Regions:
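A structural signal for short, well-ordered beta-strand segments
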Residues: 603, 691-693, 706-708, 822, ...
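Long, contiguous binding/interaction regions
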Residues: 713-909
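Phosphate/pyrophosphate-recognition segments in soluble nucleotide-handling domains
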Residues: 450-479, 696-738, 893-905
Length: 909
């Protein structure tokens, strides 16, 4: 992942088109014509070996070395067979960025993409493409693409992987008068990836929103890191194609335990704070909303129409999507009653009647939009003689400055409605073909706000903490099994693994013979269940074709020791017949759990080929189709995210509706989900783990049947909490302190820490007075992305067992891992104990270990203690005249290539 040289793609001052002619079908000719039509303000040169000196007014050169200077950007339109060689020559010439528009279709060049990538790597040039449409940056009058049209400047950045879809979006946007800050299609880009561009747009663009079209995700962690950061600053909408196996293409990817992988993408998008749209129509409607509406404050929608039928369509969709009808204030109700007396008590949706005039539409909007309980107003119009479509639209538009809330419109119909919708487009007011589409578009903004609110919530403190000893025992167990060459755990080994993480299993014995099973049955009161455990039934997510039939490897309701002994003989004989090559491990003997008013659940961890470990939850049991209620989340989980996962499921709703202790039950389930999340983070060799069923009753959660298998070390889409960075230290006054990475649950403690800082300490840290930390502040400071940030807290455990934060240090690292910026702050009453030095040394050690080249920080001139600490730690301190601060710089690692040396000398590149 890298933003290296990306500015040359989007902000070039000089540009060369390689391979262009005046022929109508010339790809390069189309690019040159677009540059001319867009009014590109920089220099353009054309490289073509033919005997031509000028094309579209631009000078043509036959040799690369003849160019007057090294261009910032090269657009390669040559045939595929020479494109890799051209890339390497451009890189050696000093060009930093190359767009490869050429497709390999029809050329049949073997290893085309690999050859392009190797050429880019050999010559230190960044390559976007092949098969990309190109780049449009209307604000800079740049159209380096083969798009058939230019686009207006706007505030939405579109980043996609399909050139043809990009063309369609341009045509649609021009028809609606909608603009873009950037329009970028990457095609099959071998070097510059989607996440690289997202990073660049987030950091360097003034775009207010990002619309993504995805076909595939080559690097899930880079992608999740980039979009998680972007969605904190901008609204990010995403549409994913290839949702079904039939549309996926080759190779087909599978996730054990899931009939369809698309829910994994939905879970990842939600976790990153994005809003997903389901189809191209919805995507276009979302664009309309993004470009023409201010951010909404909430989900309270008021609906005005000249007929109840159309407005009820909007109401149904609103409630189905989780929105709510605004409850109008008493003042607004009185105004409406005086304005239009009616016996109808329904005021939202507001039916102003089939006899309403254009002026009455305007008056209704003015009254309703002034209500403080309304977040947005939707106006639904059906054509009448008294309120013609176009005349009514023009009246609404003429008074738009008097409306106090966001306005959405749906002028229904086609013949008369079409010119009315055109007028709304010209006026920049969102308009939709149907009331349902308008509501859907409104809910995009609402869902974004909800996602952000969820991600900013402070997770409750964990009521448990797995000990280091238990985690190490679990690691040793898994390592021993993997070292033996076995790719799965036995039932007994899985029980021991879960026990290390505080997940209890029902009383279970593991007899090796029928005789031993009969003897052990004496220890269990009541009826028993018996299962045979062998290699073939030790794998998770292996289901029978008929889920309502009990497995042949399980016997239930065995009453006597003799029943158990005979049952064991029968099960072993069946195993030997059906699975003669499957090693026998043991029988699994448990008491039946009937009569405890239990609910059966299914929990587990599976591994997706793109996003890595995924946590699963839903209805469970031996005789149900558990796939119908399988919901999932991307780990690591905290209690808030676990609660969201449970709430999304049918099982969760059943608990809320039928349990007498719903909150306690939900808390217990969420704790278990967090433990599973921690387990898969601690043990990367775990490929899959399934608990089915897990029994929930009023007293306990009990795992009944479990399976677990192993694989290669997992690659997490979101970097897990770095437990290994915890360390105990002793301060000068003898007190014991733990230094550990910060986590989301620290918000309350961090707020308490902040309240004990002096105004001067706060000003030295934030460069201004900051008496309070907002909810958003706490979220940004505690729920960090460990892939690019790190924060260490020094925490002391008090005599009563409570904990408090004594100091915090943190770093923010750029996407290329070149520079990291630090900050450190210590409680005033603890300064002089060496804590600041210890926290800084922890930061320096960590940053060195991850390969960062340089640590920097800005210090107020009057902050003499910090300046002294920097000098002690070896930082070079110099006065920054422009910002009037001290810049502290510490080299951490030596650069290993020319690009890193270049970036250190040229931070903007």
């Amino acid at each position: 992942m890298s933003t290296r040289f990306l500015r040359y793609f989007f902000e070039p001052n000089t540009l060369a088109v390689i391979g262009a002619s005046e022929k109508n079908f010339s790809l390069g000719g189309q690019v040159v014509a677009n540059l001319k039509d867009a009014g590109f303000r920089g220099k353009v040169w054309i490289l073509d070996p033919k005997e031509v000196t000028e094309l579209h007014g631009y000078q043509v050169f036959s040799e690369l070395q003849e160019l007057p200077e090294v261009p910032d950007l090269a657009v390669i339109c040559t045939p595929a067979d020479v494109a890799p060689q051209m890339v390497e020559e451009l890189g050696q010439f000093g060009v930093k960025a190359a767009l490869v528009l050429t497709s390999n279709q029809g050329h049949r060049q073997t290893n085309y993409k690999q050859r392009l990538l190797e050429a880019a790597q050999n010559s230190s040039i960044r390559v976007m493409g092949p098969e990309c449409m190109g780049i449009l940056v209307p604000g800079r009058k740049l159209n380096a693409s083969y798009a058939p049209q230019n686009v207006k400047a706007g505030k939405v950045a579109y980043i996609g992987q399909s050139g043809m879809l990009g063309n369609a979006i341009i045509d649609w946007a021009n028809g609606r008068g909608i603009g873009f800050s950037h329009l970028i299609t990457l095609g099959d880009s071998v070097d510059v990836r989607l996440a690289d561009v997202i990073d660049y747009i987030n950091r360097f663009s003034n775009a207010q929103a990002i619309l993504l079209h995805l076909e595939h995700i080559p690097d899930s962690r880079h992608f999740m890191t980039a979009v998680r950061e972007a969605s904190r600053n901008k609204l990010v909408l995403v549409i994913k194609s290839g949702r079904t196996p039939q549309a996926q293409g080759e190779p087909l990817l599978f996730t054990p335990g899931l009939p369809n992988r698309d829910p994994v993408y939905s879970a990842a998008f939600s976790r990153a704070g994005m809003v997903r749209v389901d189809n191209s129509e919805e995507m276009f409607d979302a664009l309309e909303t993004l470009t023409r509406m201010r951010p909404v404050r909430g989900d309270r929608l008021a609906i005005i129409s000249n007929g109840l039928g159309p407005s009820m369509l909007a109401v149904d969709r609103l409630i189905h999507q989780g929105g709510q009808l605004a409850e109008l204030s008493a003042e607004t109700l009185n105004q409406l009653q005086a304005w239009m007396p009616s016996d109808d008590t329904r005021v939202n949706p507001l039916d102003i009647g089939g006899g309403a005039t254009p002026q009455q539409f305007v008056e209704a909007i003015q009254m309703v939009s002034a209500d403080p309980n309304v977040d947005a107003v939707l106006v639904v119009h059906a054509p009448t003689r008294l309120a013609p479509s176009e005349a009514t639209a023009l009246a609404v538009i003429a008074n738009r400055k008097t409306y106090k809330r966001n306005l959405l419109t749906s002028w229904m119909g086609l013949d008369h409605a079409f010119p009315a919708r055109h007028e709304f487009n010209l006026a920049g007011i969102p308009t939709y073909l149907s009331p349902e589409k308008a509501v859907q578009a409104f809910m995009h903004l609402v869902n974004y706000q909800r996602n952000q609110k969820l991600l900013q919530e402070t997770p409750p403190s964990l009521p448990f903490e797995t000990s280091r000893k238990a985690r190490q025992e679990a690691r040793d167990l898994v390592a021993r099994i993997a070292g033996s060459g076995r790719d799965h755990l036995t039932h007994e080994e899985t029980r021991d693994l879960l026990k290390a993480y505080g997940i209890e299993m029902a009383t279970t014995y593991y007899p090796k013979t029928a005789e031993e099973a009969a003897q052990l049955a004496k220890k269990l009161p009541g009826s028993k269940a018996l299962k045979v455990n062998h290699a073939n039934n030790s794998y998770p997510f292996v289901y029978r074709k008929h889920p309502h039939k009990l497995s042949a490897g399980l016997l239930q309701d065995l009453e006597t020791e003799a029943d158990v002994g005979k049952g064991a003989e029968r099960l072993e004989a069946k195993r030997a017949e059906k699975f003669p090559d499957s090693p026998f491990y043991s029988f699994v003997l448990q008491p039946m759990q009937r009569g405890k008013h239990s609910m059966q659940l299914n929990l587990g961890v599976t591994r997706d080929p793109v996003f890595g470990p995924v946590v699963l939850f839903g209805i469970g049991g031996y005789k149900v189709n558990i796939l119908f209620d399988r919901h999932l989340a991307i780990p690591p989980l905290n209690m808030t995210l676990a609660r969201e996962l449970v709430a999304s499921s049918h099982a969760g709703r059943l608990i809320v509706e039928h349990s007498n202790h719903a909150e306690e039950d939900l808390d217990r389930i969420c704790q278990l989900l967090v433990k599973l999340s921690q387990l898969c983070s601690d043990l990367p060799l775990i490929k899959g783990l399934e608990i089915n069923p897990l029994l929930l009753n009023r007293d306990e959660l009990l795992a009944i049947d479990v399976q677990c298998d192993l694989g290669d070390p997992a690659y997490h889409a979101i970097m897990p909490y770095p437990e290994d960075l915890r360390k105990e230290i002793t301060l000068k006054d003898g007190r014991q302190v733990e230094v550990r990475p910060i986590r989301g649950e620290d918000s309350v403690a961090l707020l308490g820490f902040h309240s004990r800082l002096s105004e001067e300490s706060i000003r030295f840290r934030y460069f201004h007075n900051k008496a309070d930390l907002t909810k958003r502040d706490l979220s940004l400071l505690t729920q960090i992305n460990y892939d690019r940030q790190m924060a260490f807290v020094a925490e002391e455990t008090l005599a009563d067992g409570s904990k408090e934060i004594l100091g915090v240090s943190r770093v923010w690292t750029d996407p290329d891992n070149i520079r990291t910026e630090f900050s450190v702050i210590i409680r005033d009453d603890l300064q002089g104990l060496g804590l600041g030095s210890l926290l800084m040394k922890k930061l320096i050690s960590y940053s060195k270990s991850v390969g960062t080249l340089e640590m920097i920080g800005k210090i107020m001139v009057e902050n003499h203690p910090m300046r002294g600490l920097m000098k002690y730690l070896g930082f070079e301190c110099r006065y920054n005249l422009e910002e009037q601060v001290i810049d502290a710089v510490l080299p951490l690692n030596e650069p290993v290539n020319d690009w890193q040396r270049h970036r250190l000398a040229n931070p903007i590149d």
